[in-house]
């Protein structure tokens, strides 16, 4: 066998292996998921008595009693303590590109130092994040879609060469050549970069960063970074997990975006795929500023109910990714039904803001049914806020009603044209925005 064929075969084997482990998935189960809703309702009922707190009777009961209790419980049992909010400093800012053609106005790179309560193992003692910000042509302030990238901003900006736009080592699958091409082929056209031009045409700005700049996504490496972000006095079993650290990073990025007069601080939208979908939901649960959230295939400890027998068990995810969570979460590996909180309660903490949950029909490991029932389980809190009831009955396309929505497109774990089509339609419907700059700004397959 020639060297070229050996290289391609090796790349195929590498990426096939990645397909079996992407997004926190230990396996990819291939049968199609039924579009008919199955499984029991989310438990415990979101307004029922919880621990020593009596049943919720009013919106003030939820806001004053239940929401703080749930936030404390999610930190102690699943995600770990949220890091303290200190501030940020923009170290540098410069324009990468100002295209003459198309709807994109400016693409900028910002180097941002995040201030932390304690110095850590980062170079200079504090995390430094490279932020790419695209603003469209036209008159602002613009709504901005903000989310992390798996492979850093070099993958987001394929035309840019030279200085790496991330301070941490990237996994090998993020390299160029055949492996990088196959990652995109398997995980979707937009696995590395969102549809820039389409977002600009629709009037949205885009903000992207690499969460691994704050906590690297490697269990053996992450611990000292997590220790530095964990608030002093936190119990060891409640040590900050990487999901919480990445959620905190999202909020710090919103600090930066909210101070930019070209952007509308009332229309900052968070999104994330897989582990970053978990972080987007958690960030918005603790931060009231995201106007809407899109979580794509966020799975266990994301949108999927933890008590389901379908999907990724706590035992598997905490064994494969122990750094993502508080150490206490692993104690439920053999008894996950004993955990008294579940993900419908996390989604309820986002009320009354719009939430879109996306899944793939062959991503059974991500538990589409459990994610749908989690939305249904959060709905009573949304109704407390006066929002329209969640009326969707099938795991297909959103019914166009209310601010809770779910879709299931064909395929596996990845980011595809259908995902961005659903997300932009949802944002257009639920978050007021300016008239699009140009007509016919739909996505091309």
Where are the language model's segments positioned?
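Bacterial N-terminal signal peptides that target proteins for export
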Residues: 2-11
């Amino acid at each position: 066998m020639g060297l070229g064929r050996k290289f391609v075969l090796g790349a195929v084997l590498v990426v096939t292996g990645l397909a079996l482990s992407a997004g926190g998935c230990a396996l990819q189960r291939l049968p199609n998921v039924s579009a008919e809703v199955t499984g029991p309702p989310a438990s415990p009922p979101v307004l029922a008595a919880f621990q020593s707190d009596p049943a919720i009777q009013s919106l003030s009961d939820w806001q004053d009693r239940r929401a703080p209790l749930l936030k404390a419980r999610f930190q102690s049992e699943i995600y770990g303590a949220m890091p303290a909010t200190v501030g940020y400093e923009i170290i540098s800012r410069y324009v990468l590109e100002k295209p003459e053609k198309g709807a994109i106005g400016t693409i900028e790179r910002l180097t941002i130092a995040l201030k932390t309560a304690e110095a850590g193992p980062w170079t200079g003692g504090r995390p430094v994040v490279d932020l790419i910000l695209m603003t469209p042509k036209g008159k602002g302030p613009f709504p901005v879609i903000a989310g992390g990238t798996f492979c850093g901003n070099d993958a987001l900006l394929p035309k840019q060469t030279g200085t790496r736009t991330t301070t941490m080592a990237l996994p090998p699958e993020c390299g160029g050549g055949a492996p990088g091409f196959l990652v995109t082929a398997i995980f979707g056209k937009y696995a590395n970069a969102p549809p820039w031009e389409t977002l600009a045409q629709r009037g949205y700005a885009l903000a992207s960063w690499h969460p691994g700049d704050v906590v690297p996504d490697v269990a053996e490496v992450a611990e000292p970074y997590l220790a530095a972000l964990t608030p002093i006095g936190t119990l060891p079993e409640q040590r900050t997990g990487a999901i919480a650290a990445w959620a905190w990073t999202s909020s710090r990025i919103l600090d930066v975006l909210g101070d930019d007069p070209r952007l509308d601080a009332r229309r900052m939208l968070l999104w994330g795929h897989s582990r970053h979908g978990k972080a987007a939901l958690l960030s918005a649960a603790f931060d009231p500023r995201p106007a809407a959230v899109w979580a794509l295939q966020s799975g266990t400890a994301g949108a999927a109910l933890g008590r389901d027998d379908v999907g990724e068990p706590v035992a598997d995810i905490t064994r494969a990714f122990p750094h993502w969570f508080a150490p206490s979460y692993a104690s439920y590996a053999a008894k996950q039904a004993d955990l008294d909180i579940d993900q419908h309660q996390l989604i309820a903490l986002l009320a009354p803001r719009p939430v879109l949950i996306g899944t793939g029909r062959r991503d059974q490991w991500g538990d589409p049914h459990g994610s749908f029932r989690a939305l249904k389980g959060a709905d009573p809190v949304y109704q407390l806020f006066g929002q329209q009831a969640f009326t969707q009955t099938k795991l297909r396309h959103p019914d166009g009603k209310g601010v809770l929505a779910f879709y299931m497109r064909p395929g596996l774990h990845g980011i595809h044209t259908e995902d961005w089509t659903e997300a932009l339609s949802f944002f257009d419907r639920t978050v007021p925005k300016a008239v699009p700059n140009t007509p016919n700004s739909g996505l091309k397959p």
